[in-house]
Amino acid sequence: MPALILRVMTLLLLGSACAQAAQDSNADLYDPVAPANSAFVRVLNLSDSNVEVTLSGKNKPQSVTGGQFGGYRFVAPGVQRITVAGQVLEHELKANTASTVLYRDGQLQLIADQFVNEPRKAQIAFYNFTAKPAALKTLDGQHVVVDMLEHDQTGSRMVNELKIAFAAYAGDARLVDFDELFLKKGRSYSYALLPAGSGFRAITLANSIDPTE
């Protein structure tokens, strides 16, 4: 089962990252391949500025744009030291898991991502980083995709391959729309609901792996 989990997670996350690297004339001939029982971790930078992320076990830092997710990086399981803009978080990352480290107001918080062993489906992860409980629904609000989440919670759902857009709802109130994406089987996608002034904003992302060592 652990080998299956690793294979599925790699398929879900890798996506276009390898294809993009292969097209880059400066890319290394061989990209790193995640060893068995790896842990995966990324940063969501909710500051207004780009931040530098360092990770124990990795040689090069990662730059994460303000207001965006960074790519997942794979590391050996165990206690890892994650540094974002000078702030340090040490956390035990378990084998065959994925985590998102939230950088917000100068503080770090780790959120355990959810994965399902089903490469024949597309996986949706919904994050609610607002104070208002919210659910992910189809645009018309008729179908719930991920049930109501409280502040700083995440939930997931497996769906068939299709092109679709979603929206975040608080009850019957439509808060914000997410970009339309073609959800491909064997891939994973992140939908994040964030505060923006007196309203809300959305991040829609096809997840990827950053293979930088």
Language-model features and meaning:
Residues 2-11:
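Sec-dependent signal peptide recognition
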Residues 22-213:
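Intrinsically disordered, low-complexity polar regions and short flexible loop motifs
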Residues 12-21:
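Hydrophobic h-region of N-terminal signal peptides that target proteins for export
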